[in-house]
């Protein structure tokens, strides 16, 4: 097993590395992860996406290698577009407790269907 495969296989989200945010002012962190992959839960075919993560940190920020490894753990999982983005959103919201967070999954078209999933902490449901 190669070292990258080993790191991904052994990654435990419970131990995801986070760092203290010592900044006195609010600011937005924007992270783009253009190589997301998961497998369709029905067919097993790969689904590819670009993940856009934005958040206003509270007391913690995610370490960049840790977010990369976490995202790569989805590579061989059978999980839907919706479930994968909701899981990423919920995990980061729980781990970081940010003042605001948004996670967008922009999936490559498959079968003439283009899907974009967005989870955000300030989402207002229309009446």
Curated annotation (Swiss-Prot):
Metabolic or biological pathway: tRNA modification; tRNA-queuosine biosynthesis
Primary localisation category: cytoplasm
GO biological process, one term: tRNA modification
Active site: 40 (thioimide intermediate), 47 (proton donor)
Localization terms from the record: Cytoplasm
One matching Pfam family: QueF
Lineage: superkingdom: Bacteria
Protein name, entry field: NADPH-dependent 7-cyano-7-deazaguanine reductase
């Amino acid at each position: 097993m190669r070292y990258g495969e080993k790191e991904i296989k052994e990654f435990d989200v419970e131990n995801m590395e986070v760092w203290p945010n010592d900044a006195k002012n609010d600011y937005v962190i924007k992270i783009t992860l253009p190589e997301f992959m998961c497998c369709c839960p029905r067919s097993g075919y790969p689904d590819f996406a670009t993940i856009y993560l934005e958040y206003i940190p509270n007391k913690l920020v995610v370490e960049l290698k840790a977010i990369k490894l976490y995202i790569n753990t989805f590579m061989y999982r059978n999980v839907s577009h919706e479930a994968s983005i909701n899981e990423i959103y919920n995990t980061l919201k729980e781990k970081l407790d940010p003042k605001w967070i948004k996670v967008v999954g922009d999936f490559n078209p498959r079968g003439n269907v283009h899907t974009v999933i967005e989870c955000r902490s300030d989402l207002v449901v229309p009446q």
